Amino acid sequence: MRNENRFHEVRFVIITGMSGAGKSIVIQSFEDLGYFCVDNLPPTFIAKFAELIRQSEGRINKIALVSDIRGGQFFESLQSALYQLNELGIEYEILFLEADTTELINRFKETRRKHPLWNQYNSIKKAIEEERKELEVIRTQSHLIINTSNMSPRQLKDKIRRQYTPEGEYESNLFVSIISFGYKHGLPLDADLVFDVRFLPNPYYVDELRPLSGNDDSVEQYVLHFDATKQFLDKMEDMIQFLLPKYLKEGRTQLIIAVGCTGGRHRSVVISNWLKDKLLKTGYQIALQHRDLDK
């Protein structure tokens, strides 16, 4: 009973639907959300897979799997799998993806891929129509149906993130990494945004501050008390707060912000610490690294 109770805390999503409707994009989106993902799982293995998850005793609590006609004997096997899940008392939800026939035909032509039922019907249109008929029953059992005909990949990803992110946690889907660095040691090659703060007054030239770092209160107070610093921080914060929702909407899951000064020990450390404290209040996941602090 202990394992069964724990499975009620698991979110178990079965992704299915029309070939070409965007299941690959959707499973990638679930992976970005931290789900344990399986693509192209034959329906006959779904119940066994769920049992294994239940035996993990809560170590895996978000699962998404794709099961479609690629798995073979799909139409009968999926109904059997759902029956087994119900018999086992395993809760699940079905996400069904579809698109208009004309749109699906265009997608197969653009990608030059064969519809999985092509060999049976030798016609893309006929294969799509037959697949749609066969999927009608499972469609009526689905908890959510998404028609992707007029959706770009980015819009589909955003739809999944908003649908499957707990209320109030949408911003946490974007991981922001802040890196302080020294230009004398080279730019971080993977940075998305770079702020050069070498124009700020340098504590290095203050004898009592030189041996300290930007993590020390006296250095922080020195750097932050200048009007130029205050103006810069206001403008930088406005820019970043404007950009983060845009990046999130675009489908980004990670953003690397680099802040550089000459040596990476004083000014960039102070500014990076300040930025981290500001962004933590917005709900985004934040990581901070002082790359060159000890060099």
From Swiss-Prot:
Does the keyword Cytoplasm feature in the UniProt annotation? no
Keyword annotations of the record? ATP-binding, GTP-binding, Nucleotide-binding
Report the domain of life of the source organism: Bacteria
Binding residues for ATP? 17-24
Q: According to the UniProt entry, where is the signal peptide? A: none
InterPro entries for the chain: P-loop_NTPase (IPR027417), RapZ-like (IPR005337), RapZ-like_N (IPR053930), RapZ_C (IPR053931)
Please give the Pfam families that the UniProt record associates with this protein.
Answer: PapZ_C, RapZ-like_N
- In which family does this protein belong, per the annotation? Belongs to the RapZ-like family.
What does this protein's UniProt record list under function?
Displays ATPase and GTPase activities.
- What protein am I looking at? Nucleotide-binding protein Nther_2024
Provenance organism: Natranaerobius thermophilus (strain ATCC BAA-1301 / DSM 18059 / JW/NM-WN-LF)
